[in-house]
Amino acid sequence: RTIPCNHVSLSAPFHWLSLGLHDFVRMPLISAFYGLCFMAAAIGIVLLVQWQGTHLVVMPSLVVYMLIGPFLALGLYDASWEREKGHHASLLHSMKAIGRNSSSQWAFAVMLAVCMIFWMRIAALLHALYPSVQGAPITDFLPFLVIGSLVGMVLAAIVFSISAFSIPLMMERRVDMMTAVFTSFNAVKSNIPAMIVWAAVICGGILIGFATYGIGMLFTMPILGYGTWHAYHETIKKKHH
């Protein structure tokens, strides 16, 4: 079963971002709480990488981040949803949202983690095939860099497509995981130009977060979380009662 979607304009992602910023300013306590959670997780990853002195811990750390990220985002979606309904958004109510339809959400989080682990295995395989000669010319590495980049882009596109609207859909309409995944994939496929812009905005926010040693997450993740809720509401067709 796939829930139908609307067609959105190329500039829509910037509108969602402005709505997310508006919610961020209007709900300082909730924004600060979830921002601190995201920031703590990001700082933990940065410190772990520095302490281990190796990039090998980056991907496992990101798998953990992929597992906890959707659950933290649920609280932000709930807060935006409450404001949309004209209710007072409270931190306690947003935290309760994390337990709503939890079996589907856990299944989805595990699926995301499996995708990340698969990605790690592909990356490790490509790395093992790299020329081992020190000082080998760049042309020897070029095919592996191109293949690695293409595989990474395809996997990133798939993960983004199945996850763009799945979590808010499971929270609001309590649908099963497969309905949410197919609906999200269909919505992204039907709005490719706008979704490329939205994916770039999200990547930019996460990069700013990590580039500032996790501190930027305090601001970027709540704004992106609220923005995702507005993106979901504008893209997925509403229920007709």
Language-model regions: role of each:
Residues 1-241:
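Hydrophobic alpha-helical membrane segments
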